[in-house]
Amino acid sequence: MAAELIKEYVPIVSEYAPGLIEGLLSWKGAVGLVAATGIGYVLIIQRLQNTSATKNLWGLTGGGVQAKDVSKVADVYDKSYGKEGDGSLTLHHLDKKESVAVVDTFYNLVTDGYEACWDTSFHFSPRPRFTNFRTAQILHEARIGYMARIQPGFKVLDCGCGIGNPGRTVAALTGAHVTGITINEYQVKRALYHTKKAGLTGLFTPVQGDFTDMPFADKTFDAAFAIEATCHAPKLEQVYGEIFRVLKPGAFFAVYEAVTTDKFDPANKRHVEIINSLVYGNGIPDMRTWKQAEEAGKNVGFKLCCAFDAGAASPVALPWWERVKDMINWGVVKYTKAACLALDSLRLLPKDYWKVANMVGDSLPDLVESGETGIFTPMYLLVWQKPEE
């Protein structure tokens, strides 16, 4: 019986997770398999416990997409990207409305997976050597609040809030009231759940909306921040312009922007391949350079107060891509993809959910390489001020 199972399933697993069988022969592979088995076990248990308050977290339901539609929606996402004449992979062939819809689709598909595998802060951070990953994430969030000059009682905008952990951190540390905006309705539901659980209802309020056309009046907020979110805008000027509009005169806006650095060479084929992978695997309409990000803010009227790569600022902090590299080296990425395939086959996940796991997982080695080569940073820190009237 065992021989028959091996004969039937080894080729399937090898097809979707190359190197899996060989990897099992190493001690790291064994550890990774145990981790994936544990994840799969929790997925199954939580899937069966329909009364669980976090069933969507571990059930990997596809967010706002119905289970029966996940396969179709994943295919639509895949076909949304097209290569430009220079080989870059962008959504330029889509209009603004269609581009926003693609980003919404992306977060419907990946939010549960992000929360399950990465926690409630959907961003990277350099890690001081005396801290763990979770502490490093909070320190990274606290810094953006400090750079935006946030004070107690301020009305603050978290632009592209995801499921809200940065906004909750800033609100809890500063005493400000933070309003977060995300394009994805499912993320609002997750944010509300975690905000109530943290006892921060009233200090952090998530709303659903397009950050290139925000439902807020002019001069509403005393400060604003964004963490690895405005990269999802069709054009940076569109989101920066809206932030400028809703800020009061004299207010500060701090952002960790995902951009290519001056080490990126558009004539280097490998560089372009890496950036294409990041664009596709992260739901980004287009990748901008650090210079384009600076110019975008100036074009809408902001005064640039400071700008630097927060990921390269410290010579002693562990790099922002460290955790992803560890996940790859320890086999967590490979075996999680295989676990999703197995759970999909058992109909414990939406049909073809493995496509989503592969969409994100396949880009992770390129993400690490982008950091190691220095051609990309997800945290180019820009601090802007809206001029006084």
UniProtKB/Swiss-Prot annotation:
GO cellular component terms listed in the entry, alphabetical order: endoplasmic reticulum; membrane
- What InterPro entries does its record include? Methyltransf_11, MeTrfase_SMT, SAM-dependent_MTases_sf, Sterol_MeTrfase_C
What is the similarity comment for this entry?
A: Belongs to the class I-like SAM-binding methyltransferase superfamily. Erg6/SMT family.
Can you name one GO molecular function term for this protein?
Answer: S-adenosylmethionine-dependent methyltransferase activity
- Annotated Pfam families: Methyltransf_11 (PF08241), Sterol_MT_C (PF08498)
Which terms are listed as keywords in the entry? Endoplasmic reticulum, Lipid biosynthesis, Lipid metabolism, Membrane, Methyltransferase, Microsome, S-adenosyl-L-methionine, Transferase, Transmembrane, Transmembrane helix
Question: Where, per UniProt, does this protein localize?
Answer: Microsome membrane
Span-the-membrane segments of this chain are 25-45
* SUPFAM superfamilies, A to Z: S-adenosyl-L-methionine-dependent methyltransferases
What's one GO BP annotation on this UniProt entry?
methylation
Q: How does the record classify its membrane topology?
A: Single-pass membrane protein
Q: What is its main location?
A: membrane
Q: What is this protein called?
A: Sterol methyltransferase-like 2
